[in-house]
């Protein structure tokens, strides 16, 4: 399942601005990974065309990776369904892909994301963390591949599932980069900066991998795309011809660096040959971009072979590395002591940079030993523990420096920091010296003994190629600067002799850099007669070589060194914008990274700089080196707390060791989601041999999970993430997770499609099997059809297993990163009250039916303590609502609950609820004989008890008192009609007849509701169509929640209240489209929903659709009123106009700007003559036009002479400020807000200047 590259709009020129939120990349790379369609803009990189963003070259890599993942997963599926597949070849191709992808990710972390984080915060960290998750997937896959048991069917399926999960995860990650990262890079960086970033990216990949990386991409894309890639590289690689030759030699696959650096030719070749868009003999057909239109004959000089007559063994050069590193560490330790003595912070950044440099050198040196030297030696040597210890010590050292920087010079702990600084420096130096000594006495003697002179030279060259170009450019002059002249010359001899002949340009570059470490760039060749490759390169003869714009600069020739070096400084214009900043030098690299310095003897070497160590964008390098070393040793992903960026250091400092916050309850849903994902993953393995019942149950569980996941992701996208983004420091932090939700929703949809097809196929197979049993025929045609169906069913079942595995891994990774990155942000940036509001906002958009299903689903995945904490948080967020009452009624009415107290979730709450029910039974349905026996004093005593009960709501008290006072009359009314009815009609009940909403059409119901039943009122035991019909003819109100019986108006049978008629003759006749078991509400006409927080049924589509419940106001509001002014329990009052209780009113209610409410009809009538709130007196809307009219009126009005100098003190009802204004008999304008909604608080005569406010 390859992820197609999105259609992007061409981003031209320097820093093209993205349209909307996503910049579109060229359609030339928009074809899917499996497409070989020619590119429509193959010449868009030409000099005549407008410039296209260099960032787009990454799309070629994405396409190559997606194509290879798709091809490998297809092989794994074939293997799982019984086809023959060479597992060895599959394993090698995956190993190659992993190596390529790992180095790409490391370079991305070092360069791309570091650069992006400079301009756009809160984006890079998520993608870096995803790299670690993908590394874990590769680890798991290789565990399977290394334990191959081809005969085990479960192994085959697990392999297919794992390859599918890897493909899905990587494809989604790359697609997100294309939608978010690339557009941001194009938008925020100029063209020259983009080219610099891509060039530094290439220079940050180890040389031995870059030699594989470029030709593999080129072989994985179409011919036109390959040409476009070459043209793009011309614009990216600096114009110096030597650099162009190095890169395009690799791109054409002409270099032997791959073979020389222990990357198997067979593995590389098999990956090239198996690529879906492999171009045979590509190197022979496609020219290097530095060559002309015709392939010329190029005569490369033979690299000087200095023979092996020297007594020194080349492998002893490892001691030179050790010596230089020890020297540098000693200088660092001395510098630390100087800082301690002086207490000067000014050089701390330079000190930190120097430490980073030597740490990177040590890490790559250790990597070279682990991957090149030690495996070649026959002895079983491993210094991985020493290497890990050194890396950890360097990391601790850098963290200490960061702490010193953050503490500041005035810190009282500065002295302690400096002491630790010296101690750490001495400790690292001691560790390194001990480690180097052990290597020199254990490993080097065996290497001298077992390897020929030539082999030792080759190993040294391979070790150097473990480093990236960016580091080699700094290391070689640094190393040669610390050597004697003889040591430096021998080092250069061995370097040149150990390289393959095809690497002439690369060795030339290395040699020139090495010479820069000597005084005045002195050439290190034994004499000045041209043996130095930098000099001999100028003798290259080109036949029929046409000039190339990308290679316009002339290499160093026999001209004067001065003119050569002057020419080197003439870099292409596109680089000057980036490289014009001042070069930074560190104490260890003075005069080393400054390019060549001509000398008078004409023997200086001049080669071009890469231009990436002048770090204008301040990109890091050490973290990528650490990541490479970690992954190379034990194939495990780096620890999550090994920072890729400095700002990650405190990423784990939140969320642990603190009391659980309200928002944590939202993340409790992650546990339930993970539990169901595990269920789908495991149970999907049983789909091949199962019955129809199992498939139906599996589909049901899948739909349940899909629904709850959708509700959860919508809550995050609509509420949680916008809350995070509202904080200025957290912009962009959630965009990646929003993209995850869209991708995961598509995965659910894909699974649903396959599951539906699988279910239909299973039914067909069962039907065919039954038909065969009946007909007892066994024709050849039937056998063929059944065989094809069974084969297709097995393929679909295997595919579905992989998809379930993929969605489990994808969602688990998504959940893990959310909890790691986003969860701590709520504790850091949101107060408890803000978190309560967020929780209330989320559950306030969740309907009763969803909550009723969701709560048991979530709590089943939690411990008892977690359940209690979650419910406490929910009740705190809903403290102003009826949620607790609804919760009790739901648990009481649950079909799974019994009448016993022990089966109820909350015994204490149920006891309270039972007490209310007992009181209700005693107060609302008394026996009439008992009522008649109560005297007036006893009745008054009961009423006083109600008034004194502080646990009762005031509305409840009024209702109970009213019923007590009318109880004698109610009892009499209950007795007399029953007796009369019994005397006249025997068992016939009053009202036992149908009523009609539309008598002509025979539609059941009443004037208030369309429904097919009547309700028996608990208060008077009579049948009424609805409570309004009851209240209309009675002097008391009907409590519909106490209704237990109903009458079906079709069969006229009284039965327990429910959604359908239980009489057999009615055959499940529905009482209404909407039935609420709590409110006992039936409505067959309107859209109605039950709000669990109002604990009432309201007209509307539902919470989260067209309404939400505000937990502060305790009312349901339209979705457009999200940003309203809250007043606690504002709807639990009477309408200020008609005095009807608003909370239970069925009429439309209008929210006023001040936060109060009134009926919409009352508002219309009231505003005909008033414009202020009848409760608080504030203006009911924007009165600017009206106030402007009053301004004009007063301006035209002239006061009598005796009132002109009189002023009045006023209080503004709108802004609540006091002020002074000129006298008027009616209108007084507020000097602060300009409102005329004011009142006079004092009148007096003062000087004319009286237009003030306070």
UniProtKB/Swiss-Prot annotation:
GO biological process, one term: cellular response to hypoxia
Disruption phenotype: Embryonic lethal. Increased tolerance to iron deprivation. Over-accumulation of iron ions in phloems, rosette leaves, flowers and seeds. In normal conditions, at the late reproductive stage, aborted siliques and abnormal necrotic lesions in cauline leaves. Increased root elongation, rhizosphere acidification, and iron reductase activity under iron deficiency.
GO cellular component: a single term: membrane
Binding-site residues, Zn(2+) 6: 1110, 1113, 1124, 1126
Topology within the bilayer: Single-pass membrane protein
Zinc-finger ranges (CHY-type): 999-1068
Binding positions for Zn(2+) 3 per the UniProt entry: 1048, 1051, 1061, 1066
Alphabetical UniProt keywords: Iron, Ligase, Membrane, Metal-binding, Nucleus, Transmembrane, Transmembrane helix, Ubl conjugation pathway, Zinc, Zinc-finger
Zinc finger map (RING-type): 1135-1176
Induction (UniProt): By iron deficiency, specifically in the root vasculature (e.g. pericycle). Destabilized upon iron-binding.
Cystines in this chain: none
Biased composition (Polar residues): 895-906
Zinc finger (CTCHY-type): 1071-1134
Annotated signal sequence range: none
Main location: membrane
Annotated binding of Zn(2+) 2, by residue: 1019-1020, 1030, 1036
Annotated Zn(2+) 1 binding sites: 1006, 1008, 1026, 1029
Tissue expression from the record: Expressed in cotyledons of seedlings, young leaves, developing and mature embryos, and other reproductive tissues including floral vasculature, funiculus, septum, and gynoecium valves.
Cellular compartment(s): Membrane; Nucleus
Binding locations of Zn(2+) 4: 1076, 1079, 1090, 1097
Biased composition (Low complexity): 19-40
Pathway this chain belongs to: Protein modification; protein ubiquitination
Superkingdom, natural source: Eukaryota
Role played: Essential protein. Negatively regulates the response to iron deficiency and thus contributes to iron homeostasis. Exhibits E3 ubiquitin-protein ligase activity in vitro. Plays a role in root growth, rhizosphere acidification, and iron reductase activity in response to iron deprivation. Facilitates 26S proteasome-mediated degradation of PYEL proteins in the absence of iron.
Subunit structure: Interacts with the PYEL proteins bHLH115, bHLH104 and ILR3 in the nucleus. Binds zinc and iron ions.
Designated name of the protein: Zinc finger protein BRUTUS
Organism: Arabidopsis thaliana (Mouse-ear cress)
Lineage per the UniProt record: Eukaryota, Viridiplantae, Streptophyta, Embryophyta, Tracheophyta
